[in-house]
């Protein structure tokens, strides 16, 4: 489908640069109104974001904040480069979509106690801890993070920045797909505390599909209590540790690969109880898996099967497709 679109644009370009721009804008608007079709965010009625509402384009922090926090369904297209120091509270029924080449620097997005949110094709970086995570999902349902580029700053102190993508407080029906997480101390936390079992147990159903983790120190991801499916992920040049399975989490890791990583690829640490993992066609790249085998299997997942690329294809494929590539 994308190949056809690219060929069509190439043909038009010969005749009219203006038509090319218009065609690209139209393609972006179509993609911005697509609903989630992969993983856990297809459950519970699905995830459509702001598709039922109007579409607006924003070019500055004030307009982005106003649109994201509004109470009506809305598709928000981010154009250009937005910089600032802020924590935006995203309301329900929102799609926030980045145009190709757009970026957001220093601004965190807080998705708390809402539902039906899509964050797509966004490049977000250098969010200081005072502004939360680059994307924080807290006590929310039906959230899709797709084709995002999330980064930090390894030259900063470990606690100067928080997570790139944290999912906490019994959040449900979340998919993270085609996303590039890189150059950061703490990438992605599922379940924030060992003491939160009463709230988190039975929740935190999350899919990580087709993601690229590069130059990350830890939490790639770190999982407490949740039910998490990881498929077609690539970890390259991790600085510390990989997938931490903790506090009775049930994890299924399929069709994935590690490269140039330290010893602990799939492991348990820093909690009272271990988590569990079923590991199927994963190239550990010389690293290790020390987690007890779990019970989560592909046949037990409630959504349509995600095509497994095969561990041998991951290193060549995922870096080319993950990130702000729409």
Curated annotation (Swiss-Prot):
- Active site: which residues? 219
Which keywords label this protein? Calcium, Carbohydrate metabolism, Cell wall biogenesis/degradation, Lyase, Metal-binding, Polysaccharide degradation, Secreted, Signal
Q: Which GO terms describe its biological process?
A: cell wall organization; polysaccharide catabolic process
Main subcellular location: secreted
Record text on cofactor binding: Binds 1 Ca(2+) ion per subunit.
Q: Which cofactor does it need?
A: Ca(2+)
| Pfam families for the chain | Pectate_lyase_4
A single GO molecular-function term is: metal ion binding
**Record's GO cellular component, any one?**
extracellular region
* Protein task: Pectinolytic enzyme consist of four classes of enzymes: pectin lyase, polygalacturonase, pectin methylesterase and rhamnogalacturonase. Among pectinolytic enzymes, pectin lyase is the most important in depolymerization of pectin, since it cleaves internal glycosidic bonds of highly methylated pectins. Favors pectate, the anion, over pectin, the methyl ester.
Identify this protein by name. Probable pectate lyase B
